[in-house]
Amino acid sequence: MLFRSVDGAQNAASAAVLKSAIRSIFKYKKLILVFGVSKDKDIKGMVNQLLPLAHKIILTRADNPRAAIPIYLKKYFAAKGKEIFITASVKEAKVLVLRIADSQDLVLVTGSLFVVGEFKDAYR
């Protein structure tokens, strides 16, 4: 069974609460972070909170004009030595998750309620 957690954390403070909750509630082998965010959010602050949890990172964007471009997001993650994937859509991110995650991994989808909603709706 692949575990999945979705959360609409969209600033550093809510990302810190999310990080604490993940650490206290879930047990997993690896955490795969699916991250997409609006370009007007505190991206650096969110990344600083969530990056320590992640083993693999999938950067994506919601179908929303305010969404940050995934290749732009990569600069916040790139120097940290994590495996990073870039997808053009949330649907593509979900396909990738299903390919790379195993039964002991936790998939965390966060950064934007738009991303969370699209992830939940993809291929229902």
Locate each region found by the language model.
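Nucleotide phosphate-binding/pyrophosphate-handling subdomain across enzymes
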Residues: 1-56
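A general structural signal for well-ordered alpha-helical segments in protein cores
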Residues: 15, 43, 70-73, 116
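Active-site-proximal loop/hinge segments that shape catalytic or ion-binding/gating pockets
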Residues: 112
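Active-site-adjacent alpha-helix immediately C-terminal to a catalytic or transition-state-stabilizing loop
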Residues: 117-124
